[in-house]
Amino acid sequence: MEFRLKQLRDAVAADAAGRVQEVRYFLDEIEKRADEMCKAERLYREGKLPKRVCHCDTKVNNMMFDEDGTVLCVIDLDTVMPSFIFSDYGDFLRSGANTGLEDDKNLDNVNFNMEIFQAFTKGYLESGKSFLLPIEIENLPYAAALFPYMQCVRFLADYINGDTYYKIQYP
């Protein structure tokens, strides 16, 4: 998260597309939460949180299903790297528990499905009980908030830079 915040701060400093003032409110909201959202890196530096082999792009689109809807495997393995379990847990919830599309024009469609959150968390904890550390389990709610926050930081940095990575279709 620290890396993504640095990218955003660099984008703000450069203001390449002249958009910083129009998004000042959002920048202030991001900065209010920055310290909290960098918790994983702090815990890692303190020796309290391990890095593990993670997929790092565990959205629903990167899962292959059979005709009955059963998950067969995870695809898009070029993103596998050492990271925190929060990466896979939080990123899946960002996409899987979202009731709308990532680029949904109608924000009334966008919500967080608590039933999916609860079912996924139950399955995640059952599957990971043999290796997850207490600090990882305690911070799963943080992970659920981290990835929407991270995407917001990424989208906003790109917008400030002039839509260089994410091509927008509408304001």
Task: Indicate where each model-derived feature is located.
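Short acidic/histidine-centered micro-motifs embedded in hydrophobic/aromatic stretches
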Residues: 1, 143, 159
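ATP-dependent phospho-/nucleotidyl transfer catalytic cores
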Residues: 1-55, 60-68, 146, 167-168
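Generic recognition of stable, solvent-exposed alpha-helical segments in well-folded globular domains
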Residues: 3, 84, 115-119, 135, ...
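ATP/Mg2+ or Mg2+-diphosphate-binding catalytic cores
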Residues: 12-15, 150-171
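Active-site Asp-x-Gly
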Residues: 52, 66-125, 129, 167-170
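A short beta-alpha structural unit
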Residues: 107-111, 137-148
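Hydrophobic alpha-helical bundle architecture
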Residues: 124-144
